[in-house]
């Protein structure tokens, strides 16, 4: 019986490799992948071959499946800078009309191409300059290519696309290349097309006219939803960055009772109900594989079509919009003798509403401070943060919004966990020690960072409600027994999925069969793995691009020494005993890794001195920016 293995290659030099069986168990197989021209993750089968002049059969292997060989768009850098070539592609015969060869035509020159995938060897790719360059100063190119053959030392590839020159001054090209490298260049063309067609069908029109989606239209589609469109009764407002167009969340605060020693308020958090728009225009089957919007320094790549993210789903002022709403009934107790206040959450309810936002404010905007409802909301939120969910230092509107998002994410997570459904975040958060000596701003950032980098898991697949399952999240640093994401459904698929499920368990809306199929598909284990992988790639891409943009716009930061805080530690025992430190630099509001061999034992939340350095990297960009520790001599 033939044996099947998978090859695992750890570097492009092929100096570290091993084989596994199909269950990913290591096996003692010694076929040299260079001799057999194998790529990382190739599936091979062991076969017996007759040896010449003997009756002995010798075991050999042949490739039965190869992801790399089938990939038509492998990203890499074509090395043209020094005009170094590696021979030519085979010569081709030119035929006359009778079919007879009349002369030999030289093939294109071969240039080295370095794949972005560090497990792949250098390729040779035929390339011909389109225009003469008398200065002979060529730039390396970001390209994609496909595998052609591998007969000699280097595999041969075929160019499929030229993205642009490797040049720090053309950052857009670098962004496009990185999207390809991290498999994030996912099209939403079909999503857009379906949306446009369904809108035109709905209004029996040959063109898209968003003016037809009036407030009256929004109100008429789901008349059973609670109507909160009267701006005199409901002062609902958003608070976001000044350039925001996709308003996910909004707030209102109403006094609903008072006595001599107590005042009662209803604090409402409104989240754009993207799911109702998906249902209204029949878009569940058209959703792409984008799991999140991507925010780059100069552009935004949205998860949803722009018509949805910046218009229909966005909580724009003076426009009727669907909102999933959390109403919190709060009692504020006044102590006359000490002039102190205490706060109690009396009740939390979830409902669907149609809202009419009064104002789209930006953080710390002057007119925001003139709104008496904002002042009340700020003071009540500050009291809540001292007692409920987590200690969060609130000194401005940005902190207030961040805390209210944590609050809603937490209470929705408790609901989902109680009902054994939804998507939660895994427990990989370490307790924040008291007296760590961190500034409150750093404390807030670290709490938010831990939540954003946690991995998701499907509750149905992981939680045993009859026992204390080790899979149940326990976010100790935030004093949380569960946590999820639901407050950003315009930009994150997990939030959209949890939004659907929260409405389901509270009987707020009867979704279609297509919606349930969408939910079941994306909460399967393989799709949650896909979400986690892509979210990690997106965070890495955004961080790298932010660093590069910062260097281009503020080059003097390279000369400066910064204070950093260690917020995560990982020991790589199998990699020369190196330690990877994740460091937060408060002054720059960025996180960077420092990888080093060290005898010094750092602990979480230790503060260190660090600098940004540039390293040459001809295979990626002209300078790679890394954070390094500054060691006092």
Question: Residues of each region from the PLM?
Answer:
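Generic detector of well-ordered alpha-helical segments enriched in charged/polar residues
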Residues: 160, 174, 178, 196-200, ...
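Structured C-terminal cores of nucleic-acid metabolism proteins
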Residues: 26, 411, 429-430, 437-633
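Charge-lined substrate channels and their catalytic hotspots, especially those that engage the 3′ end
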Residues: 1-271, 275-319, 396, 597-598, ...
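Intrinsically disordered, low-complexity acidic/polar segments
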Residues: 154, 168-169, 278, 335-337, ...
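A broad structural signal for short, well-ordered beta-strand segments within beta-sheet-rich domains
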Residues: 63-64, 159, 336-345, 538
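Short beta-strand micro-motifs in enzyme catalytic cores
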Residues: 109-111, 324, 579-581
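Feature marking long nucleic-acid-engaging regions of large polymerase/nuclease enzymes
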Residues: 17, 28-31, 127-130, 145, ...
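Asparagine-rich low-complexity intrinsically disordered tracts
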Residues: 10, 24, 31, 82-83, ...
